[in-house]
Amino acid sequence: MFASRSDLQSRLCWIILKATLYSSWFLGVFPYRFDSRNGQLKRSRFLLFYGLILNFFLLLKMVCSGGQKLGIPEAFARNSVLENTHYTTGMLAVFSCVVIHFLNFWGSTRVQDLANELLVLEYQQFASLNETKCPKFNSFVIQKWLSVIGLLLSYLSIAYGLPGNNFSVEMVLINSLVQFSFNCNIMHYYIGVLLIYRYLWLINGQLLEMVTNLKLDCSVDSSRIRKYLSLYRRLLELKGYMVATYEYHMTLVLTTGLASNFLAIYSWIVLDISMNINFIYLLIFPLFLLVNVWNLWLSIAASDLAENAGKSTQTVLKLFADLEVKDIELERSVNEFALLCGHCQFNFHVCGLFTINYKMGFQMIITSFLYLIYMIQFDFMNL
């Protein structure tokens, strides 16, 4: 997968994946152990209930200790809309954590099936191509991990940087663990989507190699086309299963991220206009906004990347039509492959509401901006 991990980027990606695995085990959000005899994951009841109890205990401890009460009391007293927005966003974040951890417990069997299918694809179907380096896969994994670390640092800067916040070390530690556990959960879906993209990228590379061989008048075995057709069909089924498993997770993540971005911008406006806050303190909010948007956008970009890789397969297959293919069986296999690509695409359509891609991401940005304008007009006299 990582080209023998010979270069820095591949080694760093490998370390991040290992760190994600061990962190998920420690926090109980990946309740599986590896069975070396058959090379498959098996669900561990101990890890399953350990994760459920630990994460709900942390959430209960955070709520009881007022872990969501980050902010400036004077700003809340001056602007009730900001206070209500702040508490609503906090409640939404807690609700999202509760639901996602419950779904992680309830759907553990489905996640196990997904992970085992990915293991089969990685070490059996694509074993001969594991040494091929996929730069975008490595880059996206590294960026996601950096954004998660950035969110933790942003939280610490808000907890200790804003005047009026006085939190104990225990409360900050609990809140940080809750946030990190939440992000580890989402990281599993994110890596799964990137693996689907990587397999599609490998298939496209092999198809391009076959086109090149045909141009050089070299023979091409039609069974290879049928093999990649079968793999493409399995990836489509895997994508559908992954969407069905994680659609509620991603809906809550996108909703919570959207609300957090809006809260950061509105807090920045209120503190800048209504109160005489030091400029250094005001930098905390745009930094948090930048990191949060980056983290949210990476989840959208990963799905868009896989979708475009599926479209690229159809483009590569069209190259066969430009060649004089004399093998009837090869031509039939290519046509069948092209027909499948034309009718089935890698659209990550969640909850029957929207498809996660760049178009949806830009629509989210426009919606947030329009809603922010509405809130400013509604609460203009209090600013």
From Swiss-Prot:
UniProt topological domain (Extracellular) ranges: 33-45, 108-144, 272-279, 382-383
Glycosylation site positions: N130
Entry's transmembrane regions: 12-32, 46-66, 87-107, 145-165, 251-271, 280-300, 361-381
Membrane topology: Multi-pass membrane protein
Tissue expression profile of the protein: Taste bristles in the foreleg and labial palps.
Localization of this protein: Cell membrane
BP terms from Gene Ontology: monoatomic ion transmembrane transport; sensory perception of taste; signal transduction
Source organism, top-level taxon: Eukaryota
Gene Ontology terms: cellular component: axon; dendrite; membrane; neuronal cell body; plasma membrane
GO molecular function, one term: taste receptor activity
Cytoplasmic-facing ranges: 1-11, 67-86, 166-250, 301-360
One Pfam family this sequence matches: 7tm_7
Keywords from the UniProt entry: Cell membrane, Glycoprotein, Membrane, Receptor, Transducer, Transmembrane, Transmembrane helix
Similarity-based family: Belongs to the insect chemoreceptor superfamily. Gustatory receptor (GR) family. Gr22e subfamily.
Cited function: Probable gustatory receptor which mediates acceptance or avoidance behavior, depending on its substrates.
Protein name in the entry: Putative gustatory receptor 22c
Name of the gene: Gr22c
